[in-house]
Amino acid sequence: MFLTQPFCQVLCSLIHVNTCDLESYQFDEQPVMEPLPDRSSPPEPRPDPTAVGAGYDFSDQDSSLAPYYLQTHHIIAVFLVGFGFTLGTMFYLWHTDIWGHMRYVQWMHENHRIPDGEPFSPWWDGRQPFTQFYTISQLGLYYVYVAGERLAGGDDVSRMAGGVEMLRVLHGIFTALRFTILIAAFLRFGRSWPVALLGLVAVLLLDLSNLAVLRPQIFGQVFCALLLLAISRDVVSRRALVGLPVMFAVWANTHGSYLIGFILLVLLLVGRIYELATLTGKPWRDYQVQRLALVVALSLTAAGTLNPYGPSYYQRTLALGNHPSLLTAVGEWKSLTFEWAPGWHWILLLSLIVIAATVTTSRRSVPPAHVLILILFGIGAGLQTRMVIWWAMLVPWVLIPHWVDLARRFEPYTLLPPGIPSLRKTMLAVVVALAAFMWSTPAGWVIDGKPSAFEDAVSPGTPWRLARQLKHPEEPDAAWLPELATILQKNYPDRRFSGSILATPMQGDYLMWALAPDIPVTYTHIHLFHPDFW
């Protein structure tokens, strides 16, 4: 009892203290839970975005600017076209197939007429007729070169560098232009952006080795692409009835490849007639047959009359293509040799494999006209190497409808879903185009204020130092070969060379531009001489 009473007093005092503390403590209020929103009611409309510029909403796909927004395939197309431009500007200017052409225009500029004979070779005897096939392309090349010279200014080497740089820019522009037209032709023929882009990649792979050389042929390639664009419709349009004859008249005065266009049109016409004759027996009632026949007739008339030589122009063109000296001495005029070494024969074999794989797996039949095109141009590519250039554009064009059929059969695996047009993709395409320009050689001219050095812009085989030393022996900086300077000083008055230069056709092209006719250069244009001359 003595121990129990004090213990109870202590325990009661503790309970009394804790109870007072609990009574004096103020508890926080419980949080109030807001009711959940009613999902059954429509959401409140968002405020309209602030308009930018002249009242345009760049984030609205239904705005008036939406039709001008680009999609993913447009970005890829810009990349491929920009790649073609950049690549064309980065290639060396070749030492052949360019300088001699510009020299003829220089002569025409000085004499105000087209030459009726070889003006630079004293050995031309007239037995082989002189024909000016390249007037328009030569004029274009020469005046672009002159514009580059004037833009660069400075001494003669600096002006030469400016002229070469402008020619490289022209090469890039024509490459990009041809790629753009081919995309349009493939898109019109197959109505599929992915397949059209695939067709351009095929052209690029088949024609890659030819892209490196700037020559009048690039004009003909652009005309061929325009022809493919015109004939990619189900029926040739009325505008093409006027435009194609005009184009053939210009093409005939630009490059001898205009015959390729005529062959293509005739094969399409013959194939269409045969196809309808077997089906209906009345091919001439078909609009496509009528318009193709009219285009062929008008184009033959235009090209055969609007040239310096009249209808004999066709015979002159065929004679050039069968010149024995060209067929035996120039590599690209020879037939393909099938060997293990690298060459264009591999391009032909690879394309034949692709053709066989495509036509055997496609559900579409091959029209007779396309069969004729593949057979005739395939044989032509085997007999003459330079035909591979046209084969590279025609094969993808013929196969486009079959690739579209295969893509539709395996669409989940081959075709991406269509992209949504957007301003961001449009801006990305602009960035890609700007990047292509910044990688090109003219961007260096814009940034540095001067073109690429002449020796860096022309091929190593260009004998420009030799020509400059022969033309300016008195200048110390022109003395490229000390041995030649010693010989000129010892054996020639005023150190000026007199006589003729025996050069290969490749080397003679630039020497003719720089030295002829003051110093005659032999063996430059071998097609101007009778075979027994050699």
Regions found by a protein language model. Give the residues of each.
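Juxtamembrane membrane-water interface segments that cap and precede transmembrane helices
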Residues: 122, 132-142, 153-160, 315-346
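Transmembrane-helix motifs of polytopic, lipid-linked glycan transferases
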Residues: 169-190
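Membrane-interface alpha helices of multi-pass inner-membrane proteins
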Residues: 204-208, 241-256, 299-303, 375-381
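Short acidic/glycine- and proline-prone juxtamembrane loop motifs at membrane-interface regions
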Residues: 211-219
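Membrane-interface transmembrane helices that cradle and orient dolichyl/undecaprenyl
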Residues: 225-241, 355-362
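Short hydrophobic alpha-helices at membrane interfaces in multi-pass membrane enzymes
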Residues: 233-249, 291-295, 368-375
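Membrane-proximal, lumen/periplasm-facing interface regions of secretory-pathway glyco-
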Residues: 414-493, 508
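Short periplasmic/luminal acceptor-recognition loop of GT-C membrane glycosyltransferases, typified by
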Residues: 482, 486-531
